[in-house]
Regions:
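Rossmann-fold dinucleotide-binding core
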Residues: 4, 97-149
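Alpha-helix N-cap/helix-start capping motif
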Residues: 10, 34, 65-68, 99, ...
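A short acidic, helix-capping loop that chelates divalent metal ions and anchors anionic groups
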Residues: 37, 71, 126-130
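Short low-complexity, flexible loop/linker segments enriched in glycine and/or proline
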Residues: 42-45, 62-64, 109, 131-135
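Rossmann-fold NAD(P) dinucleotide-binding segment
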Residues: 51-64, 68-115
Length: 149
């Protein structure tokens, strides 16, 4: 089964994580404020100390953080996803960022050999926990097909 990592467990990231756990997925999580991972940990998620640790154990990493700077930090900063990368890993960004930043981040991931999908969403935590978010995905077609099942 696919192993999923979630970086950013605020209201939306937590709701997505809870839905994935309820659906039987193996989930690991990271959040700067560790207390925001408590509900997910209680439901069975593994809590990582760094984004790189999430990357090491995940096939798909979902970022759900506050802005483009935060996305860049968790991906490319010290202890970021890139330092834990492995073959056949995909990053799916659900953060609310502008299209130019999304393109820049996608290019940097590609340069690192990491596949990426940008996934702006419509709907909030209540919709996410029920698995009914509206997703507008773009990016690596092979990864989209692999993880949309």
């Amino acid at each position: 089964m696919v192993k999923i990592g979630i970086i950013g467990t605020g209201m939306l990231g937590e709701a997505v994580g809870l839905h994935l756990l309820d659906s039987g997925y193996s989930v690991s999580v990271y959040n700067r404020t560790k207390s925001k991972t408590k509900n997910l940990e209680e439901k069975g998620a593994d809590v990582a100390e760094l984004p790189s640790v999430v990357a090491e154990s995940s096939d798909l990493i979902i970022t759900c953080v506050k802005d483009a700077d935060a996305v860049k930090q968790v991906l490319f900063g010290q202890g970021g996803v890139v330092s834990g990368k492995h073959d056949d890993m995909t990053v799916a960004d659900m953060s609310t960022i502008n299209p130019n930043a999304a393109k820049e981040i996608s290019k940097k991931l590609h340069d690192e050999g990491i596949k990426s999908i940008e996934i702006p969403v419509m709907g909030g935590p209540n919709v996410a926990i029920d698995g009914k978010l509206v997703l507008m995905a773009s990016g690596d077609k092979e990864s989209f097909e692999r993880f949309s099942k």
